Swiss-Prot record:
Biased composition range(s): Gly residues: 23-35
Phylogenetic classification of the source organism: Bacteria, Bacillati, Bacillota, Bacilli, Lactobacillales
Quaternary assembly: Part of the 50S ribosomal subunit.
Single GO BP term: translation
Full protein name: Large ribosomal subunit protein uL15
Keyword RNA-binding assigned: yes
Family: Belongs to the universal ribosomal protein uL15 family.
Region span, Disordered: 1-44
NCBIfam families cross-referenced by the UniProt entry: rplO_bact
Function field: Binds to the 23S rRNA.
TM region(s), chain numbering: none
Cited InterPro entries: Ribosomal_uL15, Ribosomal_uL15/eL18, Ribosomal_uL15/eL18_sf, Ribosomal_uL15_bac-type, Ribosomal_uL15_CS
Length: 144
């Protein structure tokens, strides 16, 4: 065996069939599409179901998007334990600590988990249980 005699194994490399290139090519004339009809012609548009009422028109339209909706970044109490005792927790400090990814319309503190440190928490909204838990731990809440 010599390098110049190397050949790919039989059947591993085949040329692609170029369709519609004359009758003697084997895939000329109808190009493997059979005779006439919708499938022999161009593509049907997206969502077309052969004349049947398409799914996107059978299903009713529902609801709307409220342009005035405010979306708050949610923070639970157990996430606040990363801050030092007596620290002031603001939306900026939460962003810096990586607890929230973006500020959105503001920050809402919820009462899931336990808080073990005395903190001053400044946020746009608080749940009742969060306020009780923060004050029970000796901290303060402030709506900004």
């Amino acid at each position: 065996m010599k390098l110049n005699e190397l050949m790919p194994s039989e059947g591993s490399r085949t040329n692609r069939k170029r369709i519609g290139r004359g009758t003697s090519s084997g895939t000329g004339k109808t190009a493997g599409r059979g005779q006439k009809g919708q499938k022999a012609r161009g593509k049907v548009r997206l969502g077309f179901e052969g004349g049947q009422m398409p799914l996107y028109r059978r299903i009713p339209k529902r609801g709307f998007t409220n342009i005035n909706r405010k979306e708050f970044a949610i923070v639970n109490l157990d996430a606040l334990n990363v801050f030092d005792e007596g620290a002031e927790v603001t939306p900026e400090s939460l962003l810096k600590a990586g607890i929230i990814s973006k500020q959105l319309s503001g920050v809402k503190v919820l009462g899931n988990g336990e808080i073990t440190k005395k903190l001053t928490v400044k946020a746009n909204k608080f749940s009742e249980s969060a306020v009780k838990a923060i004050e029970a731990a000796g901290g303060k809440t402030e709506v900004i």
